[in-house]
Design a protein with these regions (language model features):
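Extended, low-hydrophobicity, polar/charged segments
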Residues: 1-159
Length: 159
């Protein structure tokens, strides 16, 4: 089970006890925000893409949307999201629980600047009913992200 892989991974950092599991689904931004009790923008949604360099996870704020022009400028190609089957095959996490943790070595992770507005954010932990509260610094470390990128739009910078 994917959440167990994430839990084992978090043990290395002493964070395994911080995973929250819910009776209800947290598979979408709205459901996760309700389960956690925060505004949707504070949910760190993980989107999976296939690039010429291989699979990639891009983590954005819950209110952010991919800006195709910015994406192409940063990554040099059009955004191509993974199908649910490919997301599971490449990341080990099913859609609804995709997260930037406990990933195969070939999966690159990038964090969008839309997350930096908040002192803490809530990414999933490998299942459709889990989350963890992390600072952006913790998210950067635990996700082993390669860099911060600016590839989103439609987010409210005043939140």
């Amino acid at each position: 089970m994917s959440i167990e892989k994430v839990r084992e991974y978090f043990k290395l950092y002493g964070k395994d006890g911080d995973i929250r599991e819910f009776a209800e689904s947290s598979a979408t931004v709205e459901l996760a925000a309700h389960a956690v009790g925060v505004i949707p923008a504070r949910i760190a949604k993980s989107m999976s893409f296939l690039t010429h360099e291989g699979p990639m996870i891009l983590v954005l704020a819950g209110d952010a949307r991919i800006d195709n022009k910015k994406y192409k400028s940063v990554f040099g190609e059009k955004a191509k999201m993974l199908s649910p089957e490919d997301a599971l095959a490449f990341t080990g996490h099913a859609v609804g629980g995709v997260c930037p943790f406990a990933l195969p070595e070939n999966v690159r992770v990038f964090l969008d600047v839309s997350l930096r507005r908040f002192p803490t954010v809530f990414p999933a932990c490998g299942s459709s009913n889990s989350a963890i509260e992390l600072t952006c610094g913790e998210l950067e470390t635990l996700s082993r992200s390669l860099s911060w990128v600016d590839v989103a739009n439609s987010w409210d910078p005043t939140l």
